[in-house]
């Protein structure tokens, strides 16, 4: 694994200490894959595994291979199915952590249209639902790519305010939090990801 450094892990440590479950949110920015591995290394032994989602392969025979590739000590990958969502809820209620990319465009019927940088974007409701249903603490995190192969620097911060109990408003608040993160270091935003695409219909 490439070198990892933490700019600040205080938000994560304080959220774990409250024992209510932690929901880590990261946009398509920097190296989002490294954030899950870094969290598992830093907090897994003390606070239990981090649960993340993966989209199952079209060829079912590949799913076991994909799961084995993603799973490692302190990290569990679950499919983007109802069973996977249930595992995430179970983990949060047990005081463990879950990681999500809330700017991932969900399948049709699993999101709502909400503003993102001034344009309507189909936005998942899952992140807001998980936080509201379980009382999990929301922490923002991203993995900064360091120059010249120097590894990664992890940044965490609290959401900064309570999510609205209204789901639609909470989804907008999460989009706003993602915007703030991107604006802090826009050169590391993955512009190749089509945030404004129409949702797929194969939910």
Task: Label the model's feature ranges.
Residues 11, 34, 84-87:
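Well-ordered alpha-helical segments embedded in enzymatic catalytic cores
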Residues 7, 53, 157:
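Residues in well-ordered beta-strands of folded domains
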Residues 2-6, 59, 78-82, 120-121, ...:
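A conditional alpha-helix N-cap/helix-loop micro-motif detector
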Residues 16-17, 41, 82-203:
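Non-catalytic C-terminal accessory region of glycerolipid acyltransferases
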Residues 20-82, 108-115:
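Catalytic core of membrane glycerolipid acyltransferases/transacylases, capturing the structured
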Residues 1-22, 30:
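A short, well-structured juxtamembrane/interface segment
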Residues 9, 26, 104:
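Residues immediately flanking
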């Amino acid at each position: 694994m490439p070198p990892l450094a933490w700019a600040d892990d205080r938000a994560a440590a304080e959220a774990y200490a409250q024992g209510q479950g932690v929901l880590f949110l990261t946009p398509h920015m920097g190296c989002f894959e490294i954030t899950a591995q870094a969290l598992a290394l830093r907090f897994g032994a003390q606070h239990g595994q981090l649960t993340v989602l993966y989209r199952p392969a079209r060829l079912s025979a590949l799913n076991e291979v994909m799961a084995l590739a993603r799973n490692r000590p302190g990290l569990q990958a679950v499919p983007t199915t109802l069973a996977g969502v249930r595992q995430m809820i179970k983990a949060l209620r047990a005081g463990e952590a879950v990681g999500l990319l809330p700017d991932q465009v969900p399948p049709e019927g699993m999101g709502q249209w909400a503003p993102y940088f001034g344009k309507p974007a189909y936005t998942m409701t899952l992140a807001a639902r998980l936080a509201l249903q379980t009382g999990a603490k929301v922490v923002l995190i991203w993995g900064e790519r360091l120059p010249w192969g120097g590894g990664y620097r992890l940044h965490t911060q609290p959401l900064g305010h309570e999510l609205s109990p209204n789901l639609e408003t909470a989804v907008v608040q999460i989009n706003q939090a993602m915007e703030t993160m991107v604006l802090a270091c826009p050169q590391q935003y993955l512009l190749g990801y089509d945030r404004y695409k129409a949702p797929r219909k194969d939910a």
